[in-house]
């Protein structure tokens, strides 16, 4: 019967539309807050929870200085910076700049970086690419050439091999981070660059 088939079709379409009906904005926001663990009853705890927080933010870039002052503490109770270092050194989490930089002159603190699971870091870096990034300045280029030739180095080794002063090496590393050309195994290396040497209080 044609009328019966039409009714079945109409009922099916109506049911399918109901299943994909948009929710109210407040319900969507409630879902987002829970998904990102920023409500009191969904906040995470402990160092191992970092991988959960990072997974929900993977690929998202934020100012380097905001990760440990705002983003992670909002999601993880009693967050400790050492937790991120431990997860990075254990090979679980990595950090990098993904978007090309217009210049490397901006402060490291405001440089957009992303946290990601280390096992997927190559995928993110491949997607980002380094096309369009400006050339580093002379000192930054010197440091970059040393790292390219020697691989990962301790700061004192890098200072000695580059022939630059410690502050010059710090500034060069900051420029290379801002350009997205270098990163480190630990977040501690980036953390050390967030406050320029010239603005640090003496011990």
PLM region spans:
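Long, charged, low-complexity, helical-prone intrinsically disordered regions
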Residues: 1-203
